[in-house]
Amino acid sequence: MTGSWANALWETAPRAQIEAAATARVLQVIGDAYQRVPFYRWFYERAGLRPALLRTLADVRREVPFVTKADLLEFQDAPGWQALDQAGVRQFHLTSGTSGAGREFHVRDTEDLAALGTGGAYSLLWAGLRPGDRILLTIPYSQTMAGPYFQAACEAAAVSVTATICR
């Protein structure tokens, strides 16, 4: 954090630089997902999408379909549906199933867990919290990923956390 900026490089960059970086990264993620994740290869092919033909964010908005819960549930039982090498898995999560439409299964590796709080840290800093501030975290840890997410966000923002146990 520099002054009032969480990341001065990107928060003060010219719009064209931000858009160019975002475009490159989005296209890379879509291409990597197609190459590495059986679910996305199946999903994109079913939609007739060829990621190599995407060039702009406008192409992405126009051509890339949204993934629905029904899509995830349809493919979830297929072998190898996730991109992670199972040896690298550090955490497993199920959704709560409150929608009644089945439960989604999610896995996270060390890199996922290390990056977990980064986005949340920005929101805390943008909301006015500063390193050394204290926060009382009352989100249940045992029920959802929200508790660990907010804890990681506070840690990434260097905000002190007091967590309560809520059941």
What residue spans do the PLM features occupy?
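AMP-binding/adenylate-forming
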Residues: 110-122, 134-167
